[in-house]
C-alpha cells in the first residue's frame, strides 16, 4: 500500500509492535510520528515525541501542539502497552492500576485528543492493538488480559461513535509476539 503524504501517529513506537508498525508506515511513504516514554536509539527513521500515554495532561499538550501544525491526521495506531505478570492474588495494586492506565487509559487519552480532528476532516483510520489475551485467559496475565478486553470494547465504541464521520476504526488482536515485552 502507498501511504505517501499521509500523516500517521503510532504510540508505543520506541520498540516492539509499535516500532515495527511505525517502520512499515515509513517504508510505505508515510510521514510518521512515533510516541513513547523513551526511545532507546539515537536515530529513528521517523519523528519521535517523548510522551507518557497514561498522562492525560501530557497527551493533551503534545497532541494539541502537533494537531495545530498539520491539516490532517490520516492514521492513529494505538500500540502502547505494558505487561505486568503475576498471579491475581499476588499482583500489586500498582501493577494492576498501571496496566490499565497505559493499556486502556493511553488509548482513551489519545481518542479524547484526536476524535474531533477525525470528525472535522471527515475521514481517517484508527487501529488499536489489543491482544488475543482479551478473550483467551492465561495464567499470570489477569491484569493484561482484562486491560486488553477493556481496550477492545473502548476501541469498538469509538468506532461506532466515528462511523458517521467516515472514520474507520479497527482492532487487531495479535497472539504472543517475540518482543522485549514477552521476554
Question: What residue ranges belong to the model's regions?
Answer:
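Substrate-binding pocket helix/loop in short-chain dehydrogenase/reductase
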Residues: 87-88, 95-97
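Active-site helix of classical SDR
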Residues: 111, 147
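Active-site loop immediately N-terminal to the catalytic Tyr-X3-Lys motif
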Residues: 89, 136-142, 164-165
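Alpha-helical segment proximal to the catalytic Tyr-Lys
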Residues: 116, 160-161
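Conserved glycine-rich cofactor-binding loop
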Residues: 14-15
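Conserved NAD(P)H cofactor-binding loop of Rossmann-fold oxidoreductase domains
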Residues: 79-84
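Residue(s) in the substrate-gating loop at a strand-loop-helix junction
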Residues: 131
Amino acid at each position: 500500500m502507498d501511504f505517501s503524504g499521509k500523516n500517521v501517529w503510532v504510540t508505543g513506537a520506541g520498540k516492539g509492535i509499535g516500532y515495527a508498525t511505525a517502520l512499515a508506515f515509513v517504508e510505505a511513504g508515510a510521514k510518521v510520528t512515533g510516541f513513547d516514554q523513551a526511545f532507546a536509539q539515537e536515530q529513528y527513521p521517523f519523528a519521535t515525541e517523548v510522551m507518557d500515554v497514561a498522562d492525560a495532561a501530557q497527551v493533551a499538550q503534545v497532541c494539541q501542539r502537533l494537531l495545530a501544525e498539520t491539516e490532517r491526521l490520516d492514521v492513529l495506531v494505538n500500540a502502547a502497552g505494558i505487561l505486568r505478570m503475576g498471579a491475581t492474588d499476588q499482583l500489586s495494586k500498582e501493577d494492576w492500576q498501571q496496566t490499565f492506565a497505559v493499556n486502556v487509559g493511553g488509548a482513551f487519552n489519545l481518542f479524547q485528543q484526536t476524535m474531533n480532528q477525525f470528525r472535522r476532516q471527515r475521514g481517517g483510520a484508527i487501529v488499536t492493538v489489543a491482544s488475543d489475551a482479551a478473550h483467551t485467559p492465561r495464567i499470570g496475565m489477569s491484569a493484561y488480559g482484562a486491560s486488553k478486553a477493556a481496550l477492545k470494547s473502548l476501541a469498538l465504541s469509538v468506532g461506532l461513535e466515528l462511523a458517521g464521520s467516515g472514520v474507520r476504526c479497527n482492532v487487531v488482536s495479535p497472539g504472543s509476539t517475540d518482543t522485549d515485552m514477552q521476554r
